[in-house]
Amino acid sequence: MTALAHAGIAAERTREPGGSEGAEAIRRLLLEGADERWDAVSETLLFYAARREHVIRLIKPALDRGLWVVCDRFADSTIAYQGYGRGLPLEELQALHRFALGDFASDLTLILDVPAAEGLARAAKRSGSADRFERLDRAFHERLRDGFRQIAAADPRRCALIDASGDVDDVQRAVLSMVSARLGVALAP
């Protein structure tokens, strides 16, 4: 966000699930509680309820005001988590997206790629307790990584895979370089 501000680009930072009052309430339902709290379909419907609220209440109004929106996770995460991770049919998830959001999509999706074991180790080092997804087994996280990689390969115009196994500074440089190249702006750390 600092790099965008230094480049004179006004931006709104947000996250999913969450980002608006209703979506944050749904976030708590999704991330807290027992791992088996929701079946895959119920979980997906909750994610899309949160996403629709988020888009209507925050993302579209920000875009209408000429702001860039930087969102930590979006629709590709549902394809990866509930499709590749939970095994729901991808075409049904895509149909749900069209129903909830029409043709609304991100201009650029950066997929920070790290081996599953490394990602789980990093999550374990963060303060606070693990959420429902972080507690899932390594096999789930392997499917998740594979899903994100397949998403990036299927839509290389919109998606960029970034090696996130390096240190924070290296990853930041890679992100800024990719955003600069893809969106035609000069960003520096």
Describe every region a protein language model picked out.
Residues 1-3, 117-189:
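NTP-dependent small-molecule kinase module
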Residues 7-101, 174:
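ATP-dependent small-molecule kinase phosphotransfer cores
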Residues 8-10, 66, 106, 156-159:
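A generic structural signal for alpha->beta connector loops
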Residues 14, 70, 108-110, 160-162:
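Hydrophobic/aromatic beta-strand patches that form the interior of the parallel beta-sheet core
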Residues 17, 21, 50, 74, ...:
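Short beta->alpha linker loops
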Residues 44-46, 111, 132, 161:
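Short aromatic/hydrophobic contact patches that present stacked aromatics
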Residues 78-146:
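A glycine- and Lys/Arg-enriched "phosphate-lid" helix/loop adjacent to the NTP-binding pocket
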